Amino acid sequence: MPSIKQCSFCGKEIPPATGLMYIRNDGSILWFCSNKCKKSMLKLHRDPKKLKWTKSYIGGK
C-alpha cells in the first residue's frame, strides 16, 4: 500500500500518486506538494519559517 508523504517545504500531507519527487545528487529525496513549494525551496531558497502558509511558520517577532 502506498504511504502518505509529507511536503519537504510546507509540511502538508501528500496523497498517494500526487506531488513531485526531487532527488538530489547526494541521494536525498525531497517530496513537494506543488510547484510553488518546489520553486520556493530549490530556486528561491526561501525559509519556510518566514512564510505564513507553511506549517513551520513562527509568528511574531
Swiss-Prot record:
GO CC terms in record: ribonucleoprotein complex; ribosome
Protein's GO biological process: translation
InterPro entries (UniProt xref): L24e/L24_sf (IPR038630), Ribosomal_eL24 (IPR056366), Ribosomal_eL24-rel_arc (IPR055345), Ribosomal_eL24-rel_N (IPR000988), Ribosomal_eL24_CS (IPR023442), TRASH_dom (IPR011017)
Sequence positions that bind Zn(2+): 7, 10, 33, 37
GO molecular function: rRNA binding; structural constituent of ribosome; zinc ion binding
Zinc fingers (C4-type) by residue: 7-37
Signal peptide: none
UniProt keywords, alphabetically: Metal-binding, Ribonucleoprotein, Ribosomal protein, RNA-binding, rRNA-binding, Zinc, Zinc-finger
Textual note on the cofactor: Binds 1 zinc ion per subunit.
Keyword Ribosomal protein: yes
Superkingdom assignment: Archaea
Keyword tRNA-binding: no
Cofactor dependency: Zn(2+)
NCBIfam families in the record: PRK14891.1-1
Family: Belongs to the eukaryotic ribosomal protein eL24 family.
Subunit structure: Part of the 50S ribosomal subunit. Forms a cluster with proteins L3 and L14.
Entry function: Binds to the 23S rRNA.
Name listed for the protein in its UniProt record: Large ribosomal subunit protein eL24
Organism, as annotated: Sulfurisphaera tokodaii (strain DSM 16993 / JCM 10545 / NBRC 100140 / 7) (Sulfolobus tokodaii)
